[in-house]
């Protein structure tokens, strides 16, 4: 197999034709995805707050950037075409009470189109959970065959199933027969280099009536190490007629366009780069528009002020979702009130944890960001986290509005194993 177009994409971009771009749209079954960009499902990340935040960030134009791109990009072409939920256990979902399911299946109307991702190994249980997702109004349902986490693989879920193609076929057939909405699968190359099954699996998916496939171009054994092997995305694209979504090592707009040019995939899926650079979907649209218009791709890079605005926006969304209720925090007398108080306090702790996590990601690549991250992790309350962030950006010379492009950071490579 030919060597892939390796991702020193800024160099490769100079040699790409002016027409090279991420497709404007694709259709998965009857669902229109425009543009052809997908936010990857990530455990502990892609809850409803983050998904809506990404949708907003994708349409956000840095007001103060000295390099504001003047190419026209509509809201639609500047957004993320498809978002996906955190992966959800089919076994757990099928056994949950209706009230508890809401935690995993909550979404808002402005999130459409949205796909619910499931993992598991029992065809009947997965089919039952797919029906639950369809009834909840999701536009698509997706099967996770990519998660490399030991706890998931131990249950024969995620990438663990890549060693059992007959079971995968049974799952494909049972789920496909159970739901009318588009059914897709996200998978890896195979278990290891001696067991690469991606082409065979993609053909099986097509034969079983699935509507699209998404390939993370690494094996389970690789985890996130080494380079994604885009040549296998090209091989899958050559093997099937259903849409193929490419995933792996897309950190910049140049990477996204280079992947499409090298593999002819129908869409790109972005995972770990999105929490660190929420602007990436809009940047892809800007890069494509300017490349078509002038032959040279350009895009806005966030300033310090832009980063501060986005951190503030995320925190506001997070706290709105937690929905503070001061009366619950007062004296609790009944058992029901005590349960409500415990649940609320737990939600507050979770919100503060997420604030720390995302503030850390958003400040990677910013000079002095390491100091801020240390201060953030010492904070005990959400208000303290925001005070640290505000003080940091106030101290910097924001009047200069220097652009702060995201730098490649080793900590982003150490992503949670459950991100698939």
Pin down the residues of each PLM region.
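Active-site beta-loop-alpha junctions enriched in small/polar residues
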Residues: 42-44, 88-90, 119-121, 146-148, ...
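Glycine-rich anion/phosphate-binding loops
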Residues: 115-138, 160-167, 196
């Amino acid at each position: 197999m030919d060597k892939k177009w390796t991702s020193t994409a800024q160099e490769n971009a100079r040699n790409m034709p002016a027409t090279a771009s991420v497709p404007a749209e694709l259709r998965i079954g009857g669902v229109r995805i425009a543009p052809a960009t997908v936010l990857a499902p990530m455990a502990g990340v892609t809850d409803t707050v983050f998904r809506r935040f990404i949708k907003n960030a994708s349409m956000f134009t840095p007001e103060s950037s000295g390099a504001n791109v003047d190419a026209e990009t509509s809201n639609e072409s500047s957004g993320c075409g498809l978002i996906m939920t955190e992966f959800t256990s089919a076994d757990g979902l099928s056994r949950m009470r209706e009230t508890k399911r809401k935690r995993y299946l909550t979404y808002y109307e402005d999130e459409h189109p949205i796909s619910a991702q499931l993992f598991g190994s029992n065809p009947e249980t997965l089919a039952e959970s797919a029906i639950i997702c369809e009834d909840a109004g999701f536009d698509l349902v997706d099967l996770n065959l990519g998660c490399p986490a030991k706890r998931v693989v131990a249950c024969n879920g995620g990438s663990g199933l890549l060693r059992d193609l007959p079971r995968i076929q049974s799952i494909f057939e049972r789920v496909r027969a159970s739901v009318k909405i588009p059914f897709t699968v996200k998978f890896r190359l195979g278990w290891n280099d001696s067991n690469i099954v991606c082409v065979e699996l993609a053909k099986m998916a097509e034969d079983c009536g699935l509507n699209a496939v998404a390939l993370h171009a690494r094996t389970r054994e690789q985890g996130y190490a080494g380079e994604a092997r885009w040549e296998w995305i090209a091989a899958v694209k050559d093997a099937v007629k259903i849409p193929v979504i490419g995933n792996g090592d897309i950190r910049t707009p140049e990477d996204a366009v280079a992947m499409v040019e090298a593999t002819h995939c129908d869409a790109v899926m972005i995972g770990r780069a999105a929490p660190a650079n929420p602007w990436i979907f809009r940047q892809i649209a800007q890069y494509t528009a300017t490349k078509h218009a002038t032959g040279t791709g350009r895009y806005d890079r966030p300033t310090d002020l832009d980063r501060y605005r986005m951190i503030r926006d995320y925190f506001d969304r997070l706290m709105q979702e937690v929905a503070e209720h001061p009366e619950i925090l007062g004296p609790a007398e009944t058992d029901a009130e005590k349960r409500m108080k415990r649940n609320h306090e737990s939600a507050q702790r979770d919100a503060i944890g997420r604030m720390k996590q995302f503030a850390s990601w958003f400040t990677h690549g910013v000079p002095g960001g390491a100091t801020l991250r240390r201060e953030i992790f010492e904070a005990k309350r959400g208000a303290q986290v925001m005070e640290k962030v505000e003080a940091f950006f106030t101290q910097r010379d924001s009047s200069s509005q220097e652009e702060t492009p995201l730098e490649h950071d080793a900590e982003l490579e150490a992503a949670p194993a459950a991100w698939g």
